[in-house]
Amino acid sequence: MKHIDKGTVVRTVLLFIALVNQTLIMFGKPVLPVAEDQIHTLADALYSAGSAAFTIAASLVAWYKNNYVTSKGKMQKEVLQKKGLTK
């Protein structure tokens, strides 16, 4: 954990906030109050659930691919830093 850079921490925290927000919306507890009459149909509920699932999946894939979280990724980052190709 000592060797995780600031960018990874910030992206991880923002991802966590986004995932909590989507989960709350999915279970009917929106952070921003929305009138109940705005969501009446099954299509709206399915759209919300599908949107949340897509957001979660896409966020996790992007986070995993854009951060050096595996041992191989950490070695790649070291090589890139030695060559001056990354921060």
UniProtKB/Swiss-Prot annotation:
Q: Which GO terms describe its cellular component?
A: membrane
Key word Cell division present: no
What kind of membrane protein is this, topologically?
Single-pass membrane protein
Concerning Pfam families, the annotation shows: Holin_SPP1
Principal place of residence: membrane
Looking up InterPro entries in the UniProt record yields: Holin
Location in the cell: Membrane
- Keywords attached to this entry: Membrane, Transmembrane, Transmembrane helix
List residues traversing the bilayer: 42-62
Return the similarity comment: Belongs to the SPP1 holin family.
Q: Which NCBIfam families match?
A: holin_SPP1
Protein name as catalogued = Uncharacterized 9.5 kDa protein in ORF3 5'region
Say which species the protein is native to: Bacillus licheniformis
